[in-house]
Structure formats: C-alpha cells, structure tokens
C-alpha cells in the first residue's frame, strides 16, 4: 500500500549567498507506518556558487519532530539536518537538482535518516513543465517490520496559470 505525502512551508531571508530559514513540514507515509510526522526547523545554508542559475549549497538546520504512528504511538525527537544541494540549468528549458540530507537524532546515537533526491525539470513551453523526481530514503531505526530503505519515482506535468 502506497499512500504518502508531504506538505512543507518555508520562509527564508537570503543575502549574499546566505539563507536563513524556518520551515514547518507535515509528512504521512502509510507504507512506513507514519500516520503523521510534524516538524519545525530553523537554520541556515550558504551557496558557494556565484554563477546565476546555479546552486552549490551546504546547510545546517535544527529540527523538532512529533510523530504519530498508525498504532497511535507518539514520539518526540530532536534532530540535526545537514543538507548538501546542487542545482544547475543545463539548457534554457532543462534544470537538474540534487539534494542530500543527513538527519541524526541528538538523543539516540546511531539513529539517523538519509534522504537523496534527484529532480529533472523540463519546460515544455511557457505554461507546461515536466518534472521527473526520484527519492531515496534510509532510516537506521525504522518501525518493526518496515524496511530501512524506500525509493519512489514521481513524474508530473504542471500547468502555470
């Protein structure tokens, strides 16, 4: 059964390559026994690339989580979120984004998550965009009976009004 989704709200102040940000996220993933995971993060990143339409950034965020499993178990966790992001416009209508995130748990040594995303965006015309997005997740301490790794591929076409 695959029933998963993410809603995320981000706010950032950007100045001279520095990005100070706060975000809130809601995640649910029935296949991984997550009914709801709410998180709030505060941190910064720095883009070392000075080329327009390119990004090579490192970031650190401090994150608080509240997770509710399908069997109604509630856990609270504090995590560090270390990010490495690359973004490059290959052609006028093609952009590639690579993102890696390492999320260790402060309270439990050896408990960490890893998330890698590869996103290819192709602008078909002024209104349509094709997006091919692959996501790999690793959780060192998943719920019992849940595999440590998870992979999904999402293809979408969006229309801009």
Show which residues each predicted segment covers.
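Repeated loop/turn-to-beta-strand initiation elements of outer-membrane beta-barrel proteins
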Residues: 17-21, 52-56, 89-96, 122-132
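Residues that define the transmembrane beta-barrel architecture of outer-membrane proteins
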Residues: 1-5, 36-40, 54, 74-80, ...
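Gram-negative outer-membrane beta-barrel proteins
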Residues: 19, 28-34, 50-52, 66-70, ...
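Transmembrane beta-barrel strands of outer-membrane/channel proteins
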Residues: 22-26, 42, 58-64, 98-102, ...
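Outer-membrane beta-barrel "beta-signal"
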Residues: 122-123, 149-161
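Surface-exposed extracellular loop regions of Gram-negative outer-membrane beta-barrel proteins
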Residues: 3-25, 94-97, 102
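Residue-level signature of outer-membrane beta-barrel architecture
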Residues: 11-13, 26, 46-48, 86-88, ...
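Membrane-embedded beta-strands of outer-membrane beta-barrel proteins
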Residues: 7-9, 42, 82-84, 116-118, ...
